[in-house]
């Protein structure tokens, strides 16, 4: 495997900040805050985002964003494909002309512009692998061939490869990644933002809906006698939504609860027409609204399962919920065990609606004392082991290493 070229570190003046180019095929915020979270926590560096197209509706996002092909998000497939093809070279040239000290690509898919810019400028290239982009064979046809081409380019051109879980690092190794350049880098969540309700201990659910949130009240969030089982994510079979609705429906008569599904996806239309009365579909929500639901939930259920050759690599929503003091019920699959507090949440090895229903039943039967203890353990574990703070420290060390600092970065995959 050819070694990527790395530009020799150049002396940094006191006034000049290290420039980091964040690159990604497309950028949608919400929900993909992960691509920007580390930048917001490292203001000592100069950041610029380069993408084919972006759709950012959150006003708190202030990083400069360069779009090479805005039409790449067109709903019309021919227009979208044409814009993507035109935008690849434009994106590469834009990154190169900015003269970054480090290029950080999120997802190996659509990595060709970043790989090309790193080759042109000599800047070190960091590639974070997030899931399906690391698999050696996934899907068929032209799309699969395109993904494979990008994956090979990223594996060969990256100075450092970062996998979001140990599970995904193993997938990448089987796909041909160089163990010497591959590290596990957990993305982490902001435990100062994802918190239990102010003034309440983890595990204590508020009884009142904040003023102005009439939709929450109308959907039953202010009924403390009816516990909420919460799901947040894409409404798809990969996320196990079909199993969750089945398990919840078989349980609700003997263990009353409300199942709240936050998000959108391919299963949404059928769920809207056929979901039982105790199931609420909210659609996509802003982060603040997601946090409100988490603070009211008894548990978060995220039964992701193997689908079409892939498994969930990490699942930041698991960390967000636990940081809010909400234990998790999930299948033991992919990187999920790495995202749950040991002994505080429930993971079932049997991936069936019956097993899931039993786990949800057990969680809803916890006493107030046990629930509070588990909630506190969940939050403490996320804060100590999976916080954004710790993740930023690791990534800062990687950047410093690549630009000449003696600080060490993440552990190599071969050492774990």
Predicted regions and their residues:
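Conserved donor-binding/catalytic core segment of Leloir-type glycosyltransferases
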Residues: 21, 162, 202-211, 217-218, ...
